[in-house]
Amino acid sequence: MQWEVVIGLEIHTQLSTQSKIFSGSATTFGSEPNTQASLVDLGMPGVLPVLNKEAVRMAVKFGLAVNAEIGQHNVFARKNYFYPDLPKGYQISQMELPIVGKGHLDIPLEDGTVKRIGITRAHLEEDAGKSLHEDFQGMTGIDLNRAGTPLLEIVSEPDMRNAKEAVAYVKAIHAIVRYLGICDGNMAEGSLRCDCNVSIRPKGQVEFGTRCEIKNVNSFRFIEKAINSEIQRQIDLIEDGGKVIQQTRLYDPNTNETRAMRSKEEANDYRYFPDPDLLPVIIEDSFLEETRATLPELPPQKRERFQSQFGLSTYDASVLASSREQADYFEQVVSISGDAKLAANWVMVELGSLLNKQGLEIDQSPVSAEQLGGMLKRITDNTISGKIAKMVFEAMANGEGSADEVIEKRGLKQVTDSGAIESMLDEVLAANAEQVEQYRAADEAKRGKMFGFFVGQAMKASKGKANPQQVNELLKAKLEG
């Protein structure tokens, strides 16, 4: 039987506010346990929550960025459940009236196409604390520093049909929240976590299959692996005569398997009701327009502009627009070098490789956009060849200065004097007279391979400094003359 996969995602983004959503406690990551937990965060009797306006602004900003309806009358609700790191016995969240309603996001896929993914809603809520099992023998420690940190939970429609589409969607959300400056997107620190809802159904069937939710997956690679593992588990289970049970599962990267945590709860299990300590939130038109005016150019628009303005492919434009820092770096390189396609290639390939090796982000690059743009300018004006450029790039990465300084210091300027190149070629051909005779006696098919030999000898003789295009043209004329 052929199966169709149905995937919906819930992405929890930790908002980059200075203080928590309902208290004045700081949100700094990595502080000593329980040093950033106020009486409100601890759930002490008699204290009242006060809503952080900046968290509301950030949520509205996201809603506008994904073409969503904004709930101008939205309500906070209590989500009731017991867990040791939830001191109040309930989480303040939103249920019937979220701050962000239906929207959509167009995501670029690997094959160059673009797919529209629906967004069901995005709601504000407070994060829970953290249970620490590894640091204690026979007991669990509770760190409430995270309790009350503002979260925006972004719920997608079940529009994804494979793990790669799911990863592309998460990457698109990741890029948008970073562009907006509302979340740092640090998945290793838990700033962006993903719950993956996965089900399968026979191809052509309209009704959804029974879904399972994989909780708290915190890397793009693990999202893909967890979803693929769960898809295979469900297919194997059904084809062996079993039945998928709706449940919450965890992904174990060591075994590349998902394992059951508990049966999946429904909304009524949490006994949601409006929080009596918080008034409804009324968002005025003026607040909406003021927030809309602060929106930057977002990845989808930047991607389209890179394609139309610079003639880049969908893939190249998507990669370069994937982070605000990378897009800004690329545009600065283009403004200096004047060659967008050459700049795109160097930023994605050579610079990307360097940053990966050194474990750096682009805003930590040892080669500045000004340096790279200056070097590319020397390629386009024939001062250096592409091969020599790699040597110059390496030298710049090692702190040897600008491209011009490296070229001057190392004597790497390309030879473009046709007289000097002709003289050098005459010496090369004289030293390889036998091969010249063989070339002239050979047919066209063999000549192609033999020509490469002469080019190699010429570049070796010039220590890589001769202009390759001139070498090719003059060499061809001499061999066939």
UniProtKB/Swiss-Prot annotation:
Keyword Nucleotide-binding: yes
EC class: ligase
One Pfam short name: GatB_N
GO molecular function annotation: asparaginyl-tRNA synthase (glutamine-hydrolyzing) activity; ATP binding; glutaminyl-tRNA synthase (glutamine-hydrolyzing) activity
Transmembrane segments: none
SMART domains tied to this protein: GatB_Yqey (SM00845)
Keyword check for Nucleotide-binding: yes
Domain of life: Bacteria
The enzyme's E.C. designation: 6.3.5.-
GO biological process terms held by the UniProt record: glutaminyl-tRNAGln biosynthesis via transamidation; translation
Keywords from the named record: ATP-binding, Ligase, Nucleotide-binding, Protein biosynthesis
Catalytic activity: L-glutamyl-tRNA(Gln) + L-glutamine + ATP + H2O = L-glutaminyl-tRNA(Gln) + L-glutamate + ADP + phosphate + H(+); L-aspartyl-tRNA(Asn) + L-glutamine + ATP + H2O = L-asparaginyl-tRNA(Asn) + L-glutamate + ADP + phosphate + 2 H(+)
HAMAP family: GatB (MF_00121)
Family statement: Belongs to the GatB/GatE family. GatB subfamily.
Assembly behavior: Heterotrimer of A, B and C subunits.
Function field: Allows the formation of correctly charged Asn-tRNA(Asn) or Gln-tRNA(Gln) through the transamidation of misacylated Asp-tRNA(Asn) or Glu-tRNA(Gln) in organisms which lack either or both of asparaginyl-tRNA or glutaminyl-tRNA synthetases. The reaction takes place in the presence of glutamine and ATP through an activated phospho-Asp-tRNA(Asn) or phospho-Glu-tRNA(Gln).
Name of the featured protein: Aspartyl/glutamyl-tRNA(Asn/Gln) amidotransferase subunit B
